[in-house]
Amino acid sequence: MKFSQSLIALAACFLPLIAAAPVEAQHAKIRSPRAQDIIPDSYIVVFNKGVNDADIESEFSSVSRILSKRRSAHKGVGHKYNITGFKGYQIETDTGSIGEIAASPLVAWIEMDGKVQANALETRSGATWGLGRISHKATGSNSYIYDGSAGSGSTVYVLDTGIYIEHSEFEGRAKWGANYISGSPDTDENGHGTHCAGTIAGATYGVASKANLVAVKVLDRDGFGATSATIAGINFVGQNGKDGKSVISMSLRGHYSAAVNSAVESTVSNGVTIVVAAGNDGDDASNYSPASAKNAITVGSVDSTDTRASSSNYGSVVDIFAPGVNVKSASIGGKSAFSIKSGTSMATPHVAGLAAYLIGLGGLSSPAAIASKIASIGTKGSVKDPKGSVNLIAYNGNGA
């Protein structure tokens, strides 16, 4: 399964990388995805599928010897990824060392690490139409019709700028999970993650108002991070999430990355539903990750007239559309503060919340079943200008 004042808003922009020519020349395993920024001397090393723990430990010993031999001043091995079907690590080192590491028979490929950037989003006072839209087949309703289970028993992991967990919208149901931004406090200093979390499970503006929320911080106060940190966040959920009861919401995007897609696809295969933004580039979403990950649920944005937002990415990898223009939700301005934001970043949490809502109803035990249900009950044929995308708007199956 298959985004400035920039383009109205995405949460973030993966900008993976252009490899330096000397590195490419040293080994064909080193990949250089499309990019506009790079993190110098930082790499994501992916092991072959099926590699065992003993071989991995032996490999780390070998890497230590390589770094020691070259007397590298870099930090060395950082994040380690241990998802069934996706194992690897992030390393800071020089080009000579990475060439030696790439030569290992245990290494499938290496990607240069990339920056992640969160764009500023527009805010203003406005209406609350998104919940009305996903609980009715037609536009125009501001009432939200839903089952009282409201996502009870589900947990949504928000990979973003963090969550202001003290906000009244969360009623104590939000907690801190992990922080992959070095030196950053365990709170949301930006506001993007809190807004997304409010749409997912806020008491007033949330789709699944009884679901639990876990903050996984992969973007800093200025909206910057690294591809490697985002994969570390996915790995955290893979290690801590409960199969069939967990959802990842990723309102971020970047140019196509095999490492990001592989981590997403492996985590879904292990029982975690992953909902991702199509992106705000007005472009084919297949050019971006994690939007192009095969078994993620990829979400485009529509406005209150069911017209695809002009900035919303589109195409065959988009699985569904959801409200993403002028969406009201929680903000970091205070425990009762709210703001209005727009973008596929805002559409994505509507569908992540819907996945949690369906888990709360019971009877759906796998990501495939949840995705199938979302597709089968969605409002068909209402999207204006889908531009080659599926013509489907998220719907919870309740209102007329």
UniProtKB/Swiss-Prot annotation:
InterPro entries: PCSK9_ProteinaseK-like (IPR034193), Peptidase_S8/S53_dom (IPR000209), Peptidase_S8/S53_dom_sf (IPR036852), Peptidase_S8_Asp-AS (IPR023827), Peptidase_S8_His-AS (IPR022398), Peptidase_S8_Ser-AS (IPR023828), Peptidase_S8_subtilisin-like (IPR050131), Peptidase_S8_subtilisin-rel (IPR015500). Residues 21-119 form a propeptide. One of its GO terms (molecular function) is serine-type endopeptidase activity. Residues 42-117 form the Inhibitor I9 domain. The record marks N119, A120 as: Cleavage. It is found in: Secreted. GO terms for biological process: proteolysis. Optimum temperature is 60 degrees Celsius. Glycans are attached at N82. GO terms for cellular component: extracellular region. The active site is at D160, H192, S345. Belongs to the peptidase S8 family. Major secreted subtilisin-like serine endopeptidase. Mediates the degradation of collagen, the major structural protein in the mammalian host. Degrades the nonhelical regions of collagen that function in the cross-linking of the helical components. May function as virulence factor involved in epidermal wing necrosis observed in white nose syndrome (WNS) in bats. This is Subtilisin-like protease 1.
